[in-house]
Amino acid sequence: MCIRFFMEIIKTSIDGVLIIEPRVFKDSRGYFFESFSQREFDEKATPILGHSINFVQDNESMSSYGVMRGLHYQRMPYTQSKLVRCVKGAVLDVAVDIRKGSPTFGQHVSCLLTGRDEEGVKIAEQFAKESSISNPQSIINNQSSVINHH
């Protein structure tokens, strides 16, 4: 028997920012979930977004309690869509719409991501992103649609 994994895609109040909830299989041994599937993301998110996104780089960072990382953004032509998930600990992740001419310019969506919930947030290009660490030794996984240019 082949099990098909599912993720739930939830729209937020700002176009381009989505909450991603994976299906988690838990039992007495622990848990298992597919943290990302490009195929399933395309099937479920592309109709909402109106375009597909191919994530090409995967980053991980560890931060201590009280650290605030942000507001980070990229300028054209290096703007990135991001898919952010907290692996361990807790982080308040904030996405701010900095798209000129957008009806939600200057507005933000904040999501409390924890290593216990396994959910993530998809952030569109031309958004500023900030992460505020609210647990000791928090680990964040961050996928991006464009290779970082340092």
Describe the function of each predicted region.
Residues 5-119:
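Non-catalytic, conserved peripheral segments adjacent to functional cores
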Residues 14, 35, 125, 134, ...:
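Non-transmembrane, interaction-prone segments in cytosolic or luminal domains
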Residues 6-7, 128, 141:
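Compositionally biased, low-structure terminal segments
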Residues 113-129, 148-150:
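Conserved metal-binding segment of the jelly-roll/cupin
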Residues 1, 131-148:
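Short, basic, low-complexity termini and linkers enriched in Ser/Thr/Gly/Pro
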